[in-house]
């Protein structure tokens, strides 16, 4: 009888712990997103990073981190986070768009062309951005 009560107690405790842990994962992302929307990028970066610790496949946290690093003009970390988003979800249009812009900026034109082709094949929401990307690439190529 005592063993049964002990087992039930342990299972109940584990259940509550896992539920609390799942809620904290969502809280980190939600807090980070609110801070980002309020332009508190340094604070939001901390919570996005914390969300990634508990949820390493959080493509949205990586995407927001890339946007933060873009604002900080840290091209390497922006690129790393965008590449991580695309590893997690190769059809993430916003990541493809931002990575294309970054590659045009870095004069990596072959990669930019490849990403525009990818964007063309996967686009659903951001198809209107493809001509803009092509124009940026073409104008940069003409000026070189």
Named regions from a protein language model:
Residues 24-50, 54:
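Alpha-helical segment of the N-proximal tetratricopeptide repeat
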Residues 37-46, 71-84, 106-115:
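Structural signature of tandem alpha-helical TPR/SEL1-like repeats
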Residues 64, 98, 132-136:
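Canonical tetratricopeptide repeat
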Residues 51, 84-85, 118-119:
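Canonical positions in the second alpha-helix
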Residues 37-38, 71-72, 105, 122, ...:
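Register position in tetratricopeptide repeats
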